[in-house]
Structures are given as C-alpha cells and as structure tokens.
Amino acid sequence: MWLLYLLVPALFCRAGGSIPIPQKLFGEVTSPLFPKPYPNNFETTTVITVPTGYRVKLVFQQFDLEPSEGCFYDYVKISADKKSLGRFCGQLGSPLGNPPGKKEFMSQGNKMLLTFHTDFSNEENGTIMFYKGFLAYYQAVDLDECASRSKSGEEDPQPQCQHLCHNYVGGYFCSCRPGYELQKDRHSCQAECSSELYTEASGYISSLEYPRSYPPDLRCNYSIRVERGLTLHLKFLEPFDIDDHQQVHCPYDQLQIYANGKNIGEFCGKQRPPDLDTSSNAVDLLFFTDESGDSRGWKLRYTTEIIKCPQPKTLDEFTIIQNLQPQYQFRDYFIATCKQGYQLIEGKQVLHSFTAVCQDDGTWHRAMPRCKIKDCGQPRNLPNGDFRYTTTMGVNTYKARIQYYCHETYYKMQTRAGSRESEQGVYTCTAQGIWKNEQKGEKIPRCLPVCGKPVNPVEQRQRIIGGQKAKMGNFPWQVFTNIHGRGGGALLGDRWILTAAHTLYPKEHEAQSNASLDVFLGHTNVEELMKLGNHPIRRVSVHPDYRQDESYNFEGDIALLELENSVTLGPNLLPICLPDNETFYDLGLMGYVSGFGVMEEKIAHDLRFVRLPVANPQACENWLRGKNRMDVFSQNMFCAGHPSLKQDACQGDSGGVFAVRDPNTDRWVATGIVSWGIGCSRGYGFYTKVLNYVDWIKKEMEEED
C-alpha cells in the first residue's frame, strides 16, 4: 500500500459540534488550539471519510489529556462501522488513564468518527493543569474486500462473491468457475457452459462441480481446437457417473462426442468410455442433463499427438521411394523416382519429379504415381535410307535397338574415323527416352551419294568416230541446262551441279543476274527431260577468277549451282566423282565428253558422247599459236583431242565434263569441264582443270551442308 499524508488544520467548535473532513487519502486530526491547551467544557466529533474501497487507519502521534478513572472527564472516543473502538485519556507512556499508545485503529468501511470531550475544569489538588490535547494521523488503506470478516463478527456491507473474489487497490470484482456465468448483480453465478473453448495442447475438462453432483438442465458444449496437424486423444478418469436407464440408452443425461463434425460416441452410466483417438484436431463434447438427478459427472484428460500418414506404397515394381522412413507425420514428405529407363506418370501427365506431403488430415496431398517404361517414339526417317529393328519389331521403348542403313548402290553411310563398323547406324533407346548412337549421339547418320558408279557404264572397247548416241545409264551425271542457250553440267552429290561459268555469264554478253536458270536431269532425251521437270536453283556460285569481260581468257571457268531440293538417285541419275591426283591428266588418257550440243550443225535431241585422249599441253599451245590465237592457256586448263580427229565437244556441250574412269576404284571422275575451243571438230578442245579447283568446290559445298 502507498501512503500519503495531508495536513488538516485544527478545528475549533463548541460543544456538540460535528466536523466533516473532505474525502482525502491522508491527513491529520488535532484537538482545538493544539499544541496549546484545549478549552474546557467542549465536545466535537470529527468525521474522517476516505474514498470507497478503502479503510481508515488512525494513529496518535501525541496524546495529552486529563487522566481519570474510566476516562470520565476528558476523553477521545473512536468509533467505526457503528462500533466503538475505545475511549482514551491520559498521556502517552503514563499508567494513568487509558492512553491509546501506538495502537493502529482500523475501520472496515471508509468512515471513522473521532469524538473529543472535555469537562468544565482541569484541576488537580486545587491546581489548574494545562493539557495540550492530541495529534493524530490518518490514511486511506486498501480494503481487501475478499478477506473473510467472520473473525471480527462484522456484517459485510457488500454481498459476497458466490464463487471467486479478486481484490485490487480501491475495490474488488467477482468471477465464476468454468461453466458458470456472472450475473447482472456482478456477484452471483449461474451455470453456463454452452461455449467453452480449449486451445492448449493438453488439459483437463470436467462436468460442473465434478466430482460433486452436476447441476440440472445443462446444455454444455466443450470445444477443443488445436493446431492443424495434431490429433486429439481423450482419456476419461474415474469416477464416471452420468444418469442412465437400464433399458433405454441414455434417456436422461448424455455426453456426446464429435470429431470433425462426426459423432464418434454417446455415453452415460457408470462405466467410463474407452480411450479415444479422434484423428482430428477439432473435438466437441456436448453434455445434456434433465431437471433431476444426483450423478457425479465426468472428467477427462486430453492430449495431442502429431498426426501420421500411412506408409507410402508403390503401385509397381519400377517405382522407388527415396530414403523410405519407418513413419511419416504431418509436414513430412517423400520423393518417388523410377528405375533407369522408366518415367513418372501421374494420370496422363509425364512428371520430371514427384514429392508428396503429409497433410493435416493424415492423407498424402498427391496420389502415388506409376512408373512407365521410357518410349523413344518412332525413329526418325533417314533420307535415302531406312532402318530395321534388331529387337522386337515396332517396340520403341527403353533398350530397343534399330539399325539404320542406306539404299545400297546409290548411297553409302557416312562413317567417322576410328568407329567400329558394327556400331555404324546402330541406335539404342536410352533411359532418357531418346534414340542414341555411341559415336554420333542423337544425330542420325547421313546417306551420302555414291559417285562415279553408273549401273550401265559406256562400253570402252568400242572405237568411236564422230560421236555416238548414249544409252540410258551411260552418263547418269549428265545435266541439261538452258540458260543463255543450251549447256551442260554434271551432278555432284545429290544437289549440286558442276558447270562452266561462261554458261551463266557468257563472254561478250552483258552481266545478267535475272536470267532464267532451267536445269534438267535423269534422261538422255530432251523431250523426256522436259517431262521430268525443271529443278529450281537455290544458289549460284561462280569462281572469283572468272572474268566475263575478257573474251580470250577462260581462267576460272567453273561454277556451282545448288539445287533447291536434293534429287533422288537411281540408275539414271547418279553423281560423278572429283579428281584427287595428277594421274588423271596423263598424256593419252582417254576420257568421255557427253552433251546435247550441235551435231553436224544440227541441234541434238538425244545425249551423245565422244571419246577423246588427253593431249600434250605444249602441242596445244603450238597449235593455238599456229592459228594466230592469243587465247589464254593456263595451268588451270588442259586440252584433249587431236587435229586429225573429227571428234570434239561443240556448241551446246559447254559446262559438261570430261569423264575418266579410274582403273583403281572403277569409278568415273570429272577431270575437266568443257570450256572453249576453235570451232567444232577442228582440233583440240580446252577444258577447265577440275583438280585445281577441288578445294574451292568442297568449301562451297560444305558451307551449305
């Protein structure tokens, strides 16, 4: 308690007066004229009042009154709560009279009365005595309204709390035990248990007044709500006693238990229910009683446990649960994967990973997936080739194997240096679901055209004079062009045409970039070629050394045409090979020139060819000088034929190739390109030396590949 003190001035009143003191928490009270002698024949009553909720405490600091037997003459009388606390006179420390000493006077209420009385004189043996009177201090002291007052025998001015009393400085308040509600008078309690809520992880719940008889007409609802992921366990204690009937189940009073809104039991009688695992974090206990009965009720202890999920079980032998645990509880998870070569499937969806989490209701948030064998799908088609299964036909799943192959005779598979022949074209369906080769990876092989291997080669034993009509398949690389007139060319690979630059940019003509490029392949007859259709050109590449404006210089007379689309090779359409050494230009080596050019001053409708020997370069040079020609004859050219022969390429054959059979490989090689000459069948013909341009040709073709 904290104490404050306030000085109160001495009050002087005539006999019979009353002096009220304003409500304060502390102060002092004195006799009239203190510390001077007090007057005779005087009586007054001082009323000390403190705020409600406090008591008055009074202590005398000085006390000097005329002593007398029974304090009959002068005295101070103290009263409170309609009771006298004593009558006092004399001096402090003196045995005479009845001095108050250091005694503390305490009221039960917030008022105290102090009456001061003097008689007509203060004489002792004829001598007038002077007495100072008294000085007293008072203070407001907190009243503990909750303390028992039976010891004092006083009546409580306030009604007692029916259940629980709580004191505070200056007052008190009442409350009720669980299951009861404080009434309007703020002191009495009435049973009210319709919405009791418990949120702790464990605790006790009981019927009202347990183990004494519970009140009648109860409608109690005890709700337990704990964190999600916890499950509640209920254990009833002894005694368990709810009014029942021998023949009818719980007709009078009953205890109903609900978990997650579902009834899990209704109980009464004297046998306690079994321990209950509710598998829920929300439980309600409904307790109903009728108007009578004296049963003792019930009490239970509830506890919580983290909810558990069932052990995950795989749906097939290929599913793997990583780090399988003996037990899974709320917020735990597991990861499922598949054995190599299998993939997770959830419904119809392919999963890259799978994780399932244990939910607060004890179920997994996702159903267990299945593992399905990886399917690589239909193998990619191989242009100019095909594949065959080396495992079960049509099965494209994990570990299936296929063998790619090329259409023989016309195509061969591209090989890598150091690769084993047994592994070429072999692809396996991998665990990643892709077809893969050990050397090439995912990239499928290429079927490269086979060059220089005509199915029906020209008969070389026959002596040819003046040219001859070619048969189908003799020169399957032959190309018929119509750009600035008729011309020729040869097929390289399956989409490149080797020809002379001057067929695209003729000498003594203006440079033209928009000329029509008509290219035909696959037959020896012009009309049939037209029926087969023109092959669109994607790109034209002319050697940078070619000069259109220099009419006597055919240096760099070589060009490449890239077809828009690759052609399909066959017996009448095959490429020719490129040279790789100088032996193809040995003196006297026989070669073949074919074309649709002028024959005896007539336009040919069928492919014709001549057989010519490689000539001596010096002889050709001398022959040119004898004709007084200044034409350039460089190391990038060679000549063929003989002045005595009436055989030669002619107008319309330009761009065609000089083809030589390689006796070592039995392949036909394009050693030259028909470039220029002096008239037709009048001596030597001059050809672009292809060997000197092989690097340029390969570079141009590789850039597009």
UniProtKB/Swiss-Prot annotation:
Cleaved and activated by autocatalytic processing to generate Complement C1r subcomponent heavy and light chains that are connected by disulfide bonds. It is found in: Secreted; Cell surface. Activated by the C1Q subcomplex of the C1 complex following C1Q binding to immunoglobulins (IgG or IgM) complexed with antigens to form antigen-antibody complexes on the surface of pathogens. Immunoglobulin-binding promotes autoactivation of C1R, which results in the cleavage of the Arg-Ile bond in the catalytic domain. Residues 1-17 form the signal peptide. The modification Phosphoserine is found at residue 206. It is an enzyme of class 3 (hydrolase). Glycans are attached at residues 125, 221, 514, 581. It holds the Pfam family CUB. The modification (3R)-3-hydroxyasparagine is found at residue 167. Ca(2+) 1 binds at residues 66, 74, 119. Its EC number is 3.4.21.41. The active site is at residues 502, 557, 654. Residues 18-141, 193-305 form the CUB domain. GO terms for cellular component: blood microparticle; extracellular space. The keyword Disulfide bond applies. GO terms for molecular function: calcium ion binding; serine-type endopeptidase activity. Belongs to the peptidase S1 family. PANTHER family: COMPLEMENT C1R SUBCOMPONENT, COMPLEMENT COMPONENT 1, S SUBCOMPONENT-RELATED. The CUB domain 2 shows a compact folded structure in the presence of Ca(2+), whereas it has a flexible, disordered conformation in the absence of Ca(2+). Ca(2+) could provide a switch between the folded and disordered forms; low Ca(2+) could provide flexibility to promote autoprocessing and activation of CIR. Serine protease component of the complement C1 complex, a multiprotein complex that initiates the classical pathway of the complement system, a cascade of proteins that leads to phagocytosis and breakdown of pathogens and signaling that strengthens the adaptive immune system. C1R catalyzes the first enzymatic step in the classical complement pathway: it is activated by the C1Q subcomplex of the C1 complex, which associates with IgG or IgM immunoglobulins complexed with antigens to form antigen-antibody complexes on the surface of pathogens. Core component of the complement C1 complex, a calcium-dependent complex composed of 1 molecule of the C1Q subcomplex, 2 molecules of C1R and 2 molecules of C1S. The C1Q subcomplex is composed 18 subunits: 3 chains of C1QA, C1QB, and C1QC trimerize to form 6 collagen-like triple helices connected to six globular ligand-recognition modules. Within the C1 complex, C1R is a dimer of identical chains, each of which is activated by cleavage into two chains, heavy and light, connected by disulfide bonds. This is Complement C1r subcomponent.
